[in-house]
Amino acid sequence: MSKRVVIFGASGGIGSATYEVFKNAGYLVTPIAGRQINFVYMASHSDVDDILEQVEPDIIINCVGHFDKTNKETHCNTFDVNVGSNWSIIRHYINKQVSDKPIKIIMVGSSAYKSGRKDYILYAASKAALYNVWQGACEYFKDSNITLGLINPVRTRTKMIDIKTSAICLEPEDVAQEILSMASTQSNQLVDMNYPEGN
């Protein structure tokens, strides 16, 4: 039987590439885009529970992200989306307490989690917080059938950020292939993606 996959943020650059990769690999994929859920309020959105209850996925992939330069308006959206959306998924399984089948939760972070950046202070901070969420959740679920993956790519060519055509960066398909590889392993994983060799 094909495994069932839910992809949050499936209309974005990495999300849409991930949808195509999993669909072509034979998974039963349920894509969730921003028009179905307001990702800013996803941290307290009952629709997340409803989707996970209805689909009963084997793999949950969260590609939702918010990227903005540092200004006084960025705080709530940046943390609500980059941290809160992932927490809402983890919280769903904490509330269930037990799973009778293996479940893999995969979150998309950023290489920015390693160091602050002056123009993206809160973005980098939110990705560092996501790393800690991943660590804590791995510890929480260590005696269960639930495992978690966190993938931290370097700069990736998506519409979310303004990148010059000539800039060195990953392609969304590169990240999607790494997510596919991560989904095949039932263990906790942290992957820091770098630029291809030679760049």
Regions found by a protein language model. Name each.
Residues 33-47:
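Rossmann-fold cofactor-recognition segment
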Residues 71-79:
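Substrate-binding pocket helix/loop in short-chain dehydrogenase/reductase
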Residues 150-151, 165-199:
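C-terminal helical subdomain
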Residues 153-163:
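Short, flexible catalytic-loop segment of classical short-chain dehydrogenase/reductase
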Residues 8-20:
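N-terminal Rossmann NAD(P)H-binding glycine-rich loop of SDR-like oxidoreductase domains
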Residues 67-70, 104-142, 155:
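Catalytic loop of short-chain dehydrogenase/reductase
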Residues 7-8, 61-65, 103-110, 147-152:
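Structural signature of the Rossmann-like NAD(P)-dependent dehydrogenase/reductase core
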